[in-house]
């Protein structure tokens, strides 16, 4: 499997990744595959802290020199944090999509929703 799809994360077909943190909060970002398709990212719009998002609801926008794409909430929950550094350094979503390039953090409405998302292996099958 590709090293660009970390095994410890969960994924959705719309190319967002999720990481369940020890405190039960879920960190969300776009995948390496998504940033590769977009090319050089030049603008990021993030959701508002406190927003309650439904699963698959638009949570933000990412724009590159080639295209604009919506970013979706992979599961329902309340936005508890956004990556304050990303709007001023959107290229971080290209250079470190699974680390410093995260987009927002959700307090899931139902943490069990996390368990049914795509594994790294399943997501790899989606993008091959």
UniProtKB/Swiss-Prot annotation:
<protein>
    <recommendedName>
        <fullName>Glycine cleavage system H protein</fullName>
    </recommendedName>
</protein>
<dbReference type="InterPro" id="IPR003016">
    <property type="entry name" value="2-oxoA_DH_lipoyl-BS"/>
</dbReference>
<dbReference type="GO" id="GO:0019464">
    <property type="term" value="P:glycine decarboxylation via glycine cleavage system"/>
</dbReference>
<comment type="function">
    <text>The glycine cleavage system catalyzes the degradation of glycine. The H protein shuttles the methylamine group of glycine from the P protein to the T protein.</text>
</comment>
<dbReference type="InterPro" id="IPR000089">
    <property type="entry name" value="Biotin_lipoyl"/>
</dbReference>
<dbReference type="GO" id="GO:0005960">
    <property type="term" value="C:glycine cleavage complex"/>
</dbReference>
<dbReference type="InterPro" id="IPR011053">
    <property type="entry name" value="Single_hybrid_motif"/>
</dbReference>
<dbReference type="InterPro" id="IPR017453">
    <property type="entry name" value="GCV_H_sub"/>
</dbReference>
<dbReference type="InterPro" id="IPR033753">
    <property type="entry name" value="GCV_H/Fam206"/>
</dbReference>
<dbReference type="InterPro" id="IPR002930">
    <property type="entry name" value="GCV_H"/>
</dbReference>
<dbReference type="Pfam" id="PF01597">
    <property type="entry name" value="GCV_H"/>
</dbReference>
<comment type="similarity">
    <text>Belongs to the GcvH family.</text>
</comment>
<feature type="domain" description="Lipoyl-binding">
    <location>
        <begin position="25"/>
        <end position="107"/>
    </location>
</feature>
<keyword id="KW-0450">Lipoyl</keyword>
<feature type="modified residue" description="N6-lipoyllysine">
    <location>
        <position position="66"/>
    </location>
</feature>
<comment type="subunit">
    <text>The glycine cleavage system is composed of four proteins: P, T, L and H.</text>
</comment>
<dbReference type="GO" id="GO:0005829">
    <property type="term" value="C:cytosol"/>
</dbReference>
């Amino acid at each position: 499997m590709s090293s660009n799809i970390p095994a410890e994360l969960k994924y959705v077909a719309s190319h967002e990744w999720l990481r369940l943190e020890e405190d039960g909060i879920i960190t969300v970002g776009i995948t390496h595959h998504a940033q590769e398709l977009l090319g050089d990212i030049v603008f990021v719009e993030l959701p508002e802290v406190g927003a309650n998002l439904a699963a698959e609801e638009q949570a933000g926008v990412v724009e590159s020199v080639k295209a604009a794409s919506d970013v979706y909430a992979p599961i329902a929950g309340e936005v508890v944090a956004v990556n304050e550094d990303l709007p001023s350094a959107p290229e971080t979503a290209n250079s470190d999509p699974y680390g410093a390039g995260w987009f927002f953090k959700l307090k899931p409405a139902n943490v069990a929703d996390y368990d049914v998302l795509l594994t790294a292996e399943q997501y790899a099958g989606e993008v091959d």
